[in-house]
Amino acid sequence: MEMLQGLLLWLLLSVAGVWASRGPLRPLCRPINATLAAENEACPVCITFTTSICAGYCPSMVRVLPAALPPVPQPVCTYRELSFASIRLPGCPPGVDPTVSFPVALSCHCGPCRLSSSDCGGPRAQPLACDRPLLPGLLFL
């Protein structure tokens, strides 16, 4: 009887896990539009712009039982293909490069976080925090 209960519990948890991973609360890794901010200490304003970034859910595993094995690497939603675009900050003094370049996500995938090209730190409390006055809204896709 205990074996049957254990099997039933395993089956229910398996089905629930599959159902939860496909639900609307966890959109899978994909390009989305996001508004970011750019500034330069030598220029008088901060400017916001809209671009595409990679965001969404990546399936992952965590070891439940302690083991002598190293932890399982956790995949993150990151760029598969990208291009770069640039904006010019207005009002920069002569001799200061007003150009700010940024990545534009063309496609995304779940994979290891590469610190050389990605910020792997998770969500920010203030993603649009600027030290300079804010000049709103450019759209670059």
Curated annotation (Swiss-Prot):
Gene Ontology terms: cellular component: cytoplasm; extracellular space
Domain of life: Eukaryota
Pfam families to which the protein is assigned, alphabetical: Cys_knot (PF00007)
Gene3D superfamilies listed in its UniProt record: Cystine-knot cytokines
Compartments reported by the entry: Secreted
CDD domains in alphabetical order: GHB_like (cd00069)
Assembly and interaction partners: Heterodimer of a common alpha chain and a unique beta chain which confers biological specificity to thyrotropin, lutropin, follitropin and gonadotropin.
Protein name according to UniProt: Lutropin subunit beta
Source species: Sus scrofa
Taxonomic lineage from the root: Eukaryota, Metazoa, Chordata, Craniata, Vertebrata
Gene: LHB
